[in-house]
Design a protein with these regions (language model features):
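C-terminal beta-strand-rich structural cap/linker in extracellular carbohydrate-active enzymes
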Residues: 67-68, 623-647
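C-terminal motif of bacterial Sec signal peptides marking the signal peptidase cleavage site
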Residues: 43-44
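Loop/helix patches that line or flank the sugar-binding groove of alpha-linked glycan CAZymes
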Residues: 438-441, 446, 450-610
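Hydrophobic faces of well-ordered beta-strands that scaffold small-molecule active sites
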Residues: 67-69, 116-118, 188-190, 347, ...
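N-terminal structural segment of carbohydrate-active enzymes
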Residues: 49-187, 195-206, 210-225, 231-273, ...
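Short, acidic/polar
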Residues: 94-108, 324-340, 459-463
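Glycan-recognition surfaces
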Residues: 369-450, 457, 464, 468-471, ...
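Active-site neighborhood of glycoside hydrolase catalytic domains
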Residues: 287-386
Length: 647
């Protein structure tokens, strides 16, 4: 009897235990499922803050905004600090490919950078003796500076010998840099300059069967569709008359400086001058390339059919496959494909608007067929041509210089009203993601120069606007993030811009470089703070629709002045941002920022309070929504910015 009862109880306990296990498993599975659904729901739902209610962070964005870091390769790794005007590379030093180390690349990547534009890599004209490896001398009278313009390319199938430890092995050293860059998770962009080349173009490195520019030209005529150059028949080239007390090499004696340069017949100059004697301010060190446009402007090549602005690059590629195109087009396609084979991920095209859009359709469709993810950037300054170069020319990105850059610079430098920002974005709203934003590059004056802002901190609100106002890529120029002034008298180059024509050191960059440690060891505290600001900002990826709230607040908000600029980004099912900037370097502002009804309705925010967190410095605030309108208490100091995210 007792044995029977014992066995019965034992079975019952086992049954109860089994039930407990099953219950535990089911409840935990349900909890896991519930928590998963709840967590996913948080990505797409916002709930007003209630009493004792915790704020849950959203999942981080998966995709990363493109950030380009422009390196002027000849200057980047240079440790020499003498900075003698017109100095030789032995005196003033020169950067090498090998100076761009894994450590340097990792520190650059930490800034939020995705792409590096290695500027000045193709072999260009320069004053130096490399005859021992088969390179002919360049005449200083048609070289700007001693180091030379990077946009007077002499050999498209090799790289600047100055950049190599072993100039005879220069191409291999560049390939190693490409691989090193890729190994550090970064993409490589390099220059192609289709509009013009050096007056003495001479490729000694071209693959077998590739002809030099002009090799088969008929130089007895001004124009032929298959000539690479335009000619001035029966007239020889004459050097320009120098101005402003200029002398080649600063007046230094040189065996090739004799007042003449042999070119007969003369060729048109790079900026389009048709005179056998260009002016001093012409691009006299270069010659204009012929893309099949006659001197009277006729296009002597096939035209894209109507509607092709809406077609894919694949369709453009198929269109050109059986078409006869000018010889110069063929040469540049060969050049681009050559560098793609070397591992380059994209190109920055110099003065792209001086070359017909049909050529870009031809070239860029071929590039995209080879590498659909290639990064294609055009230097262009004509807003009326923007859409053609994007849609017909298949450019990924264009310089946003004459609209956003100029507007922001005028606010920073000249105290212009921030009212000018919104009209720029309105004008570009259909192509805003195609516009590359920047506040510095090799052509522009340094922010920290006295000719621009003098103090680099004065441009930080502009940098915030530039980086966050759209999905466009952001570009910064090496040294910008540590307040480089570009104040040196380098020789040909003038102070305020870091010279691209001379051998020179870049002082603030050198302090960050710290003799190759790349740890900022010589930077001042202010420079360290500046770099940290850039690092925080460039790692922030703001997405979603841009809505201007500046003009609404100008009308409806007391104490909201035209030194402030506010806008929103975001989507109803995603992250939402309210961005506020104070461009004044002396005034603080205290006001109740209004979020108008169109934003609240677009975001579908119910009434209530919403926690805000600034992504720059983690300060907090509250968004109050009532009657389909929002408000935020803002107390903003001089040159301060908030990138508020609704948590």
């Amino acid at each position: 009897m007792y044995i029977f009862m014992f066995l019965l109880l034992k079975k019952a306990n086992i049954f109860v235990s089994l039930l407990s296990i099953i219950k535990y498993f089911i409840m935990n599975k349900l909890n896991i499922l519930f928590m998963s659904i709840f967590s996913l729901g948080l990505v797409h739902c916002y709930k007003p803050i209630g009493k004792n209610e915790k704020v849950t962070k959203q999942l981080s964005e998966v995709s990363q905004k493109k950030v380009v870091y422009q390196i002027f390769t000849r200057l980047f790794g240079n440790k020499e600090t003498k900075n003698i005007p017109w100095g030789t590379k032995e005196q003033n030093g020169v950067g090498k490919f090998e100076d761009i180390t894994d450590t340097a690349l990792q520190e650059i990547k930490k800034l939020g950078v995705t792409h590096i534009w290695y500027t000045g890599v193709p072999h260009h004209a320069l004053v130096g003796d490399y005859k021992y490896i088969g390179i002919s001398d360049d005449d200083p009278e048609v070289v700007k500076g001693r180091a030379g313009s990077p946009y007077a390319v002499k050999d498209y199938y090799n790289v600047n010998p100055d950049l190599a430890v072993n100039p005879a092995n220069r191409l291999a050293e560049y390939e190693q840099l490409i691989q090193r860059t890729h190994n550090n998770g970064l993409k490589v962009i390099m220059d192609i300059v289709p509009n013009h080349i050096a007056r003495k173009y001479e490729s000694i490195s071209a693959p077998k069967g590739v002809q030099n520019f002009g090799q088969t030209d008929n130089s007895t005529v001004v124009f032929d569709v298959d000539n690479n150059f335009y000619y001035v028949p029966n007239q020889s080239f004459v050097l320009p008359k120098y101005e402003n007390n200029y002398l080649p090499l600063g007046g230094e004696k040189h065996k090739m400086i004799d007042g003449k340069f042999e070119e007969n017949p003369a060729k048109w100059t790079g900026n389009g001058s048709r005179s056998p004697q260009p002016n001093f301010d012409d691009w006299y060190e270069t010659v204009k390339l012929n893309f099949g446009i006659s001197p009277d402007g006729e296009k002597e090549f096939p035209q894209l059919p109507k509607g092709y602005e809406n077609e894919s690059y694949e369709k453009h590629y198929q269109f050109w496959k059986d078409k006869k195109v000018p010889n110069t087009w063929l040469k540049f396609k060969e050049i681009a494909l050559f560098w793609l084979e070397k591992g380059v991920d994209g190109f920055r095209f110099d003065m792209a608007e001086m070359v017909p859009v049909e050529f870009w359709s031809y070239l860029n469709s071929a590039i995209k067929m080879k590498n659909p993810k290639s990064f294609l950037l055009a230097e262009i300054y004509n807003p009326k041509a923007y859409r053609d170069y994007i849609h017909k020319g298949k450019m990924d990105y264009l310089y946003d210089k004459v609209q956003l850059y100029d507007t922001l610079r005028n606010i920073v430098q000249r105290g212009h009203s921030t009212d000018g920002i919104a009209p720029v974005q309105e004008d570009l709203k259909d192509i805003s993601s195609h516009m590359l934003h920047f506040l510095e590059n090799h052509d522009e004056q340094r922010i920290a120069s006295k000719e621009f802002a003098e103090k680099p901190e004065k441009a930080l609100p502009a940098m915030v606007v530039s980086h966050t106002i759209s999905d466009a890529p952001t570009m910064i120029y090496f040294g910008q993030e540590v307040g480089e002034e570009g104040a040196e008298n380098a020789g040909f180059g003038s102070p305020s811009r870091t010279s691209i024509f001379d051998y020179i050191g870049v002082p603030s960059h050198q302090k960050w470089m710290n003799n190759g440690k790349f740890d900022g060891g010589q930077l001042s505290n202010n420079q360290k703070k500046l770099r940290e600001y850039y690092k925080k900002l460039l790692n922030i990826d703001v997405k979603g629709k841009y809505i201007d709230i500046h003009h609404y607040n100008r009308k409806h908000t007391p104490f909201y002045k035209d030194k402030i600029y506010a806008f929103t980004r975001g989507e109803k099912g995603g992250k939402k941002y309210i961005i506020v900037n104070n461009f004044s370097s002396i005034e603080s502002f205290d006001f109740q920022l209004q979020i108008p009804e169109n934003v609240i309705k677009y975001w579908q925010l119910p009434e209530g309070k919403y926690a805000l967190k600034d992504k720059l410095f983690e300060s907090r605030s509250i968004l109050q929504v009532k009657d389909n309108k929002g408000s935020i208490k803002i107390n903003i100091k001089p040159l301060e910015s908030f990138i508020y995210e609704i948590e």
